[in-house]
């Protein structure tokens, strides 16, 4: 990934070309182009390649664009840094959708698949753990990783260990979402995320103790994108991070925007030798759940980040190279959340259909409950696959005995077969095929 070009100093440009730039502000065609660029929130590195009306120098357009933005900026000071951001109209729309989703329609839609609620939380946590690990270099496929998590298999390599760590840490987040964040909790989460994956085990759950860490291109190490602050500043920065996360003393910041700021700050502080990205995304989840946005339990945001990982990286670099303008990072992350929400809605529609089919199955088969009907549908979808109790237990979020009793009940009714393979019992669809498809 090529590092974006840093914009020229707008004050210097304005000083040199004041009269030419001022004239352009009276040109409606030019201003229409400027407004379009602002709506898209283009960075200088994008603007300089755009076709500009009347071949006007891009530097002139950039000055007008920056003046327009600066009039709308909100300031945010952290440590010795001053960040700023603009609440674009598009932000307000997306945040409203998320607020309404948490309060109303989407919630009732999820409740309509109540028997699958826990199941979907488990599935989304798996998806998030897999994708978040893939962003950091884990090499595996989703089906293999999901099977490992469902069967609770022991991880065989570095990539699988990353995924197991991520999944277990997200489960931990669900149990501690009411807590206030502290430096010790951040270290605890980092230790959980990085267990048995670091070159030097002593860095699990500890802040870095050197300045050798840089953010660089994984294929071209000499291409450094960003140099984090001195390691000696980390304890005080993390203390300030926790104060910012836990306090509402500042001017109001929408919780989702603030959660994204926390995500960004961990990447910016880079407090750890490794695992900064996974820790940042985990803390984002903690924060929005802590603020009552339970909807995020059902969204695998990192799966969207994986689809556009270059844009994810650029959202950091655009912010850094444009005077710490957080709008780039916020805009990208809100777009990924919107896409994750769309994925969730698609899932709910599919699950409502499957649940309806399961209810029809109950009518035709009798003697089974809704969960058992859904288990049967799972067997029908994977007619050649053999399932073990642990897998059903994980998929449906039930206790071991409940999963075992469901499978034995379906076997007694003749819908499944129980087979012993290498001292372990497995279940498969009955060859009698007496279940209506």
Regions found by a protein language model. Give the residues of each.
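FIC/Doc superfamily catalytic core
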Residues: 1-274, 278-437
């Amino acid at each position: 990934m090529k590092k974006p070009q840093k914009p020229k100093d707008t004050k210097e440009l304005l000083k040199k070309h004041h009269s030419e730039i001022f004239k352009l502000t009276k040109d409606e065609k030019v201003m229409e182009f400027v407004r379009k660029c602002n709506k898209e929130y283009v960075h200088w590195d994008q603007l300089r390649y755009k076709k500009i009306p009347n071949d006007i120098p891009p530097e002139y357009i950039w000055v007008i664009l920056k003046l327009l933005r600066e009039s709308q900026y909100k300031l945010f000071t952290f440590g010795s840094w001053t960040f700023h951001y603009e609440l674009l109209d598009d932000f307000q729309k997306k945040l409203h959708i998320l607020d309404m989703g948490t309060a109303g329609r989407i919630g009732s839609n999820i409740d309509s698949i109540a028997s699958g609620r826990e199941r979907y939380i488990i599935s989304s946590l798996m998806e998030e753990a897999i994708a978040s690990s893939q962003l950091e270099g884990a090499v595996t496929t989703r089906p293999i990783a999901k099977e490992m998590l469902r069967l609770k298999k022991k991880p065989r390599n570095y990539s699988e260990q990353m995924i197991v760590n991520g999944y277990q840490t997200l489960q931990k987040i669900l149990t501690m979402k009411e807590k206030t964040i502290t430096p010790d909790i951040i270290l605890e989460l980092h230790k959980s995320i990085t267990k048995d994956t670091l070159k030097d085990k002593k860095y699990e759950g500890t802040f870095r103790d050197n300045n050798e860490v840089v953010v660089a291109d994984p294929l071209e190490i000499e291409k450094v994108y960003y140099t984090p602050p001195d390691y000696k500043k980390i304890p005080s920065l993390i203390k300030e991070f926790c104060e910012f996360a836990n306090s509402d003393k500042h001017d109001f910041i929408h919780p989702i925007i603030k959660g994204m700021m926390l995500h960004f700050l961990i990447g910016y502080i880079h407090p750890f030798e490794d695992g900064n990205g996974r820790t940042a995304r985990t803390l984002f989840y903690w924060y929005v759940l802590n603020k009552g946005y339970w909807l995020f339990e059902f969204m695998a945001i990192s799966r969207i980040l994986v689809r556009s990982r270059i844009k994810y990286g650029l959202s950091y670099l655009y912010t850094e190279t444009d005077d710490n303008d957080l709008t780039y990072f916020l805009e990208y992350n809100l777009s990924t959340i919107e896409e994750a929400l769309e994925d969730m809605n698609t899932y709910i529609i599919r699950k409502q259909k499957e649940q309806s089919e399961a209810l029809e199955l109950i009518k035709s088969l009798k003697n089974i409950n809704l969960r058992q009907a859904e288990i049967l549908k799972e067997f029908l979808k994977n007619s050649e696959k053999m399932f073990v109790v642990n897998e059903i237990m994980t998929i449906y979020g039930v206790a071991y005995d409940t999963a075992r009793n469901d499978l034995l009940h379906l076997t007694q009714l003749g819908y499944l077969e129980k087979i012993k393979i290498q001292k372990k019992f497995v279940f498969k669809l009955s060859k009698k095929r007496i279940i209506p498809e």
